[in-house]
Curated annotation (Swiss-Prot):
Keyword Electron transport set for record: no
Free-text cofactor note: Binds 1 zinc ion per subunit.
GO CC terms, sorted: cytosol
Keyword Glycoprotein in annotation: no
Organism: Clostridioides difficile (strain 630) (Peptoclostridium difficile)
Reactions that this protein is recorded to catalyse: tRNA(Ala) + L-alanine + ATP = L-alanyl-tRNA(Ala) + AMP + diphosphate
Protein family per UniProt: Belongs to the class-II aminoacyl-tRNA synthetase family.
Protein name per its UniProtKB record: Alanine--tRNA ligase
Length: 879
């Protein structure tokens, strides 16, 4: 058996199945396309789900891929063992109602024995215990020795996820030899030992499982196979773990070189090296597919991986930023299969560098805080960190909860995850609407997928808003029906339509569908299963039936307004790249008739001056009256023309290219104007951050700009009246009022400072001594926080040595401030711990540094009791 590298194995696999009539698809993005049910692509078939369910028509009934995948379900084991990984590639061949078991098994055997040259006597196979067809194909048609065939039960050899498509599977194993086995003389696949390594699963999707657990035969049977590239690399290179496989080993060696730590000499260091090696692969591919670090969703997965790798670099003694440097090696070993990595190299490095730098700024302080929590837990004989403290580490210092758990586990401690999650939910409630469920895969079918034949709705609306068509399908109450009547809410499918379906960030068209017996108000238009276009609306009068001839009329005003905003997004995109840099990519958009929203990848706020330049550029192009042209061409020609593609989007062989003179060229399927002058005018309304590394611009065009300027003019007139100023003198009048306010504020601050010093003199004599430490406590009412902190500082300075604990009651709330001199810190005093315990008495919480801390509470009746408790806390700290 000849050794093969990962890149060669991948190439051979795709070449083999191409020779068998398969369409070779490039790996899909790790970000699912139009699938909110899945966070990240985690299997070879995941991006093909709509082909299996019939929602979309595949480019061929035979396909093969080598698909990038991410799984983080067992991330805590990555690095701890040499088997687990978060990033991997899954090679697979697929049939959508074409070939079935015979061809799948036959070609699998041919590839393994003739293309990979794996010795036949090293191969074992398993089949589902009730699948006689597969068994006979292996035994009788392939002449495979029955002594190396094993029948296994449902848990091992039957694939299903709840209800829906499912079926038996046949797995191919490699016999690694007796030295990997157990003492069982009957050892074979199905045993838990390491001898038999499963490397290729062939799933025969032939059944449909209902909610009662009954199985019925599918009309169109499918094939879904999966072969882990890295696992096959272990077999072909004769190594035990993926970290010894050529391309991954190369990255591991780069980690060794950067850290100066040798792999294989220290088990603890080996864990860190494996974690960094695995995670930098995942991070590189995630960023290349447009994922950015954030605190939720797939962005959180990226942040978690990146920060975990960064921490383990520190454990290996790395002090500077280093993850960026490892990206070079990841790209080097993957550049042939994934040229996009080369194209996005500088962008990937920038994203990773910024995130690592952010984490470096807080990790030392966060680690110090966590270590102090750990010390308190051990001193008090406790083993569980509170959820509130874990959340503070997450919210203030950027510690993902998983990282906190990992550090605690190293000390044989744990965290109250339930309480942490409660704190997280509170924050989400405060900061944003709860986001939808993104866990797991949904197999809910579009009713249109039940149609016996494909409905190819043809869109004729790029240049026309009027048209004619025939009703091909009617959906009412999520069921296909033959007819519908006045008042019914329906979705109808036409063979031809001028209604644009929602897509590319642009909302769907609205309007009317009519004939002599019908008026249907279309409220929205969307893409449906089987290449259909769904017209969603209400029957205002009459009735409809399948086969009826109808006329389509798109609302001209809303179509034109949406086209203005869509064309403007192209001009905006180009202007943003000119002003901010080529790293800018579209990260999302929303085009409605009322306004446009455009998200971009950029790593800092866009200044007002930059926004002015961007806005001016767009308006200059509008005034230049450039022709807008839309052409269909192959993807290669489009790229040669310099067309900008949507980051991470999957395109077919033919694409639609929208050109605006020589200024902007983009791939786009939306509706557009014919000349830039039709935009009228462009105005940016706002700019802000929506996630780490993502900025959002909202803007308006055309008549909306006129209405906006008219409203602003009215506001300015009203301000002039209220300030008794003329418009040309308004700025000067406002500046004068601000200066007056500034002087009054300074007078107020000086007065409060004077009162604070007077308070110090009257309070100082109340000091007491606790275990050799001077302590001053006092309660104020109606004082602002700045003055309270200033008073505490003045008391501490006058005290010279000791602790100051102050409380301030405002309305029904109380604030605590604790400060301590440097010398008492050496005696064990910790202001953060004091304020936390004191605040608890009054129903509050807080914390901070050893020398300074503050807290808030709600029970004002317990303030005196809380202040008195400060002396008890000090007694426990000073031994």
């Amino acid at each position: 058996m000849e050794k093969m590298g990962l890149n060669e194995i991948r190439s051979k696999f795709l070449e083999f199945f191409e020779s068998k009539g398969h369409y070779v698809a490039n790996s899909y993005s790790l970000v699912p396309n139009n699938d909110k049910s899945l966070l990240l692509i985690n299997s070879g078939m995941a991006p093909l789900k709509n082909y299996f369910s019939g929602v979309e028509v595949p480019p061929s009934v035979r396909m093969c891929t080598s698909q990038k995948c991410i799984r983080t379900g067992d991330i805590e084991n990555v690095g701890i063992t040499a088997r687990h990984a978060t990033f991997f590639e899954m090679m697979g061949n697929f049939s959508f109602g074409d070939y079935f078991k015979r061809e799948s098994i036959k070609w699998g055997w041919e590839f393994v024995t003739e293309w990979l040259n794996i010795p036949e006597d090293k191969i074992w196979v398993t089949v589902y215990e009730e699948d006689d067809d597969s068994y006979d194909i292996w035994a009788k048609e392939m002449n495979f020795p029955e002594e190396r065939m094993v029948r296994l039960g449902k848990d091992d050899n039957f694939w299903e996820i709840g209800t829906g498509p499912c079926g038996p599977c046949s797995e191919i194993y490699f016999d690694r030899g007796e030295e990997y086995g157990c003492d069982n003389p009957d050892c074979k696949p199905g045993c838990d030992c390491d001898r038999y390594l499963e490397f290729w699963n062939h799933v025969f999707t032939q059944f449909d499982r209902d909610e009662e657990g009954n199985y019925s035969l599918l009309e169109n049977k499918n094939i879904d196979t999966g072969m882990g590239l890295e696992r096959m690399g272990c077999i072909m290179q004769g190594v035990d773990t993926i970290f010894e496989v050529d391309t991954i080993k190369s990255i591991l060696e780069a980690v060794e070189k950067l850290t100066g730590v040798k792999y294989g000499e220290n088990p603890k260091n080996d864990i860190s090296i494996r974690i960094i090696t695995d995670h930098i692969r995942a991070v590189t591919f995630l960023v290349s597919d447009g994922v950015l670090p954030s605190n939720e969703g797939r962005g959180y997965v990226l942040r978690r991986l990146l920060r975990r790798a960064a921490r383990h670099g520190k454990l290996l003694g790395v002090k500077e930023l280093f993850l960026q440097k490892l990206i070079d090696e990841v790209i080097k070993v993957n550049d042939k299969a994934y040229p996009v990595l080369v194209e996005k190299e500088s962008y990937i490095k920038k994203v990773v560098g910024i995130e690592e730098e952010k984490f470096n700024e807080t990790i030392d302080q966060g680690t110090e805080i966590l270590n102090s929590y750990i010390e308190v837990l051990k001193n008090e004989g406790k083993t569980v960190l509170s959820g509130q403290e874990a959340f503070k580490l997450y919210d203030t210092y950027g510690f993902p909860i998983d990282l906190t758990k990992e550090i605690l586990e190293e000390e044989h401690l744990s965290v109250d995850e339930e309480a942490f999650n409660e704190e997280m939910e509170k924050q989400k409630e405060r900061a944003r609407n709860a986001r939808g469920n993104m866990d797991g895969e949904s197999w809910k079918e579009d009713p249109l997928s039940k149609l016996e034949s494909t409905v190819d709705s043809t869109f004729n609306g790029y240049s026309e808003i009027y048209g004619e068509g025939t009703i091909e399908a009617i959906v009412k109450d999520d069921e296909l029906v033959q007819s519908a009547e006045e008042g019914d809410k329906v979705s109808i499918v036409l063979d031809n339509t001028t209604f644009y379906p929602e897509g590319g960030g642009q909302v769907g068209d609205c309007g009317l569908i009519t004939n002599e017996n019908l008026v249907l108000e279309v409220l929205n238009t969307k893409k449906g299963a089987n290449n259909s276009i769904k017209h969603i609306g209400i029957i205002k009068s009459g009735r409809i039936s399948n086969g009826d001839k109808v006329k389509t009329l798109v609302d001209r005003e809303t179509r034109m307004s949406a086209a203005r905003n869509h064309s403007a997004t192209h001009l905006l995109h180009k202007a943003l790249r000119e002003v901010l840099g080529e790293h800018v990519n579209q990260a999302g958009s929303l085009v409605t008739p009322e306004r446009l929203r455009f998200d971009i990848t950029h790593f800092e706020a866009i200044s007002n001056e930059e926004l002015k330049v961007i806005e001016e550029k767009v308006n200059n192009v509008i005034l230049s009256s450039l022709d807008i042209k839309c052409d269909i061409m192959n993807i290669k020609e489009a790229k040669e023309k310099g067309a900008t593609a949507l980051f991470g989007e999957k395109y077919g062989d033919e694409v639609r290219v929208v050109s605006m003179g020589d200024y902007s060229t983009e791939l786009c399927g939306g509706t557009h104007l014919t000349n830039t002058s039709q935009v009228g005018m462009f105005k940016i309304l706002s700019e802000g951050g929506v996630a780490a590394g993502v900025r959002r611009i909202e803007a308006i065009t055309g008549k909306a700009v006129y209405e906006y300027l008219k409203e602003r003019d009215g506001i300015i007139s009203e301000v002039c009246v209220n300030l008794k100023s003329k418009e040309d003198n308004l700025i000067q009048r406002i500046s004068s009022l601000l200066e007056e306010n500034k002087n009054l504020s300074k007078e107020l601050h000086d007065m409060k400072a004077k009162m604070s010093l007077q308070s110090v003199d009257s309070i100082f004599d109340s000091k007491v001594e606790v275990n050799g430490v001077n302590l001053i406590t006092n309660k104020f009412e109606g004082m602002d926080m700045d003055t309270l902190r200033e008073t505490a500082d003045n008391l501490r300075d006058k005290l010279g040595s000791g602790v100051v604990v102050l409380a301030n009651v405002v309305d029904d709330k109380v604030n605590f401030v604790v400060t301590a001199t440097k010398d008492v810190l050496d005696k064990g005093i910790h202001s953060g711990n004091i304020v936390r315990e004191v605040a608890k008495i009054a129903g509050g919480k807080g914390g901070g540094r050893p020398n300074m801390a503050q807290a808030g509470a709600s029970d004002v009746s317990k303030v005196d009791q809380a202040l008195s408790y400060a002396s008890e806390v000090i007694k426990t700290q000073v031994k």
